[in-house]
Amino acid sequence: MSNLFMDLRLTHEQPTPENTLPVSEYRAFSPERFSVEDEDKHVVYSGGSGYLVTVMKNDPTTTISINPAIVPIFQEQVDLYVLNSCLLLWSATHKFGVEVPYQKIVLHALQHQQDQDVLYLQLRPGEQLNAKTESDYEPYIEITIKSSEPHSGLAICPPGTDTIPAIYDGMAQCSALHADEDESTEEDNGNELATDIILNQSVSSSADDLDIDLEADSAEHPVVAGMSVDVGYASIAGRRKRDDQDNHPAKRRS
């Protein structure tokens, strides 16, 4: 199966000093290389402890399902590691994590909400986190990540990289390492890297947070959304993987 459709993966391997390497140290030893997926150690770009991860439900015509095995990730504070291979959400309480491949992330962006920076993601659906819609277009799953108290850095992460902007910057660097490998065969220019964009988009009405029981609660503040929703007046800066149909807000299902 193409890496483009790599799914979220459950893991019990926590990043440690023995199996990771700070990006600055790695570049000092290997300045001409920026990815070590074939080696034993993961490269750590940024990360920290004390984040809340929320699945958003903006479209009433879309049904989202979550594998019960990964539900704790969305119920409590988690640690976050931006690795060269994936974005890792780790539950210290339950001693497991969810690896999010960068190929799975359609869009990652920054938004400012209630005087707080929030990381906004759009993911392609899969077995672990799925979405079905009545629309003719394939749905994306929207996730927000924000800092919570108590919040701190982690010993194996570079100092000062536990902020949401630092998490975003680390993801931007790592995402650029992973080109989509399943672009349309009709295109002659091959695979394309993620492209910097500025999005002036937001949901034009309040969205609902998605509880684990999939019942929506009213949200007090609009949530910035991406390509397949109505737009309003707030702005976010983000980075999006280019689909093979850039002129459409989402890919039409076959």
Swiss-Prot record:
Localization terms from the record: Cytoplasm; Nucleus
Pfam families: Voldacs
Alphabetical UniProt keywords: Cytoplasm, Nucleus
Coiled-coil annotated spans: none
GO biological process, one term: mRNA cis splicing, via spliceosome
GO cellular component: cytosol; pICln-Sm protein complex; spliceosomal complex
Domain of life according to the entry: Eukaryota
InterPro entries xrefs: ICln/Lot5/Saf5, PH-like_dom_sf
Gene3D superfamilies (UniProt xref): Pleckstrin-homology domain (PH domain)/Phosphotyrosine-binding domain (PTB) (2.30.29.30)
Family: Belongs to the LOT5 family.
Protein name per its UniProtKB record: Protein LOT5
Species per Swiss-Prot/TrEMBL record: Meyerozyma guilliermondii (strain ATCC 6260 / CBS 566 / DSM 6381 / JCM 1539 / NBRC 10279 / NRRL Y-324) (Yeast)
Lineage summary: Eukaryota, Fungi, Dikarya, Ascomycota, Saccharomycotina
